[in-house]
Design a protein with these regions (language model features):
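Short, Lys/Arg-rich, polar N-terminal cytosolic tail immediately upstream
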Residues: 1-13
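N-terminal signal-anchor transmembrane alpha helix
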Residues: 12-42
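Hydrophobic cores of alpha-helical transmembrane segments in multi-pass inner/ER membrane proteins
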Residues: 21, 25, 80-87, 140-149, ...
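Extracytosolic (periplasmic/ER-lumenal) interhelical loops and adjacent juxtamembrane/interface segments
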Residues: 42-70
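Individual transmembrane alpha-helix segments
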Residues: 61-91
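Cytoplasmic juxtamembrane regions at transmembrane-helix boundaries
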Residues: 87-113
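Membrane-proximal helix-loop-helix units in multi-pass membrane proteins
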Residues: 109-149
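Terminal transmembrane helical module of multi-pass membrane proteins
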Residues: 148-219
């Protein structure tokens, strides 16, 4: 127990590549701010979904007015986030003890990344079925991945608790989101409670791995 294996692919000379890739997920939040500010009329964090920022047309969509001049930037951000989730999962997995739990956890996060890729490739007003399928993958699989990794990764107790709680809260609000029980959060607010925790976790986990002794233990 406690045995770590160094990354054998891509990162023998660059051991922080995986964590840095996950830290780059911060671009997702930066781009949302930029695209939201450029939104025609008023973009509401409560009543507009994240995907509205990537909608390629102007007009009424699902009862909401959408018009995002920088939709291409937002969709590129979705694609980049998906790539960082998937590639980072592949690289960082190599740093941990190989067991079924870590394999399943990182695999689910990688698949969630592929789903996020779909969100950017197929904006909500194009092939809605593929967009919805793509969005469901990080919403469901990404948050399940957090719970699994909280149970199997060798992490300090506070970080394990943070990881577990992030996944549980997001899945709870996902149920409310899917049953249209938005309450005072609105559709946009409740969607963000579902979507943001795992992305914030990716950033924090990347920072954590670059600043602690994990990589040193693998020497």
């Amino acid at each position: 127990m406690g045995q770590f294996i160094k990354i054998k692919v891509f990162t023998d000379k660059y051991p922080f590549l995986g964590p840095i890739i996950w830290i780059l997920s911060v671009q997702y939040f930066i781009v949302q701010i930029i695209v939201g500010v450029a939104y025609k009329y008023s973009y509401s964090l409560r009543f507009n979904t994240i995907s509205d920022l990537g909608n390629t047309s102007c007009g009424i969509y699902s009862g909401r007015y959408v018009c995002s001049p920088l939709h291409n930037l937002m969709n590129a951000s979705f694609i980049m986030l998906g790539l960082t989730m998937a590639l980072g999962s592949l690289l960082i997995y190599q740093e941990f003890r190989k067991d079924r739990g870590t394999l399943v956890g990182f695999s689910l996060m990688a698949i969630a990344g592929l789903g996020t890729l779909f969100v950017g490739i197929f904006p909500e007003n194009t092939i809605s079925l593929l967009h919805t399928l793509g969005a469901s993958m990080p919403f469901i699989l990404g948050n399940i991945a957090l719970i699994i990794m909280s149970l199997y990764l060798l992490l300090p107790s506070p970080f394990k608790i943070y990881t577990f709680v992030s996944g549980v809260i997001a899945l709870f609000f996902l149920i409310l989101f899917k049953t249209s029980l938005y309450g005072s959060f609105g559709i946009g607010g409740i969607e963000r409670i579902v979507a943001y925790p795992q992305t914030i976790w990716l950033i924090f986990f990347g920072i954590y791995m670059t600043r602690n002794e994990y990589l040193k233990r693998s020497k």
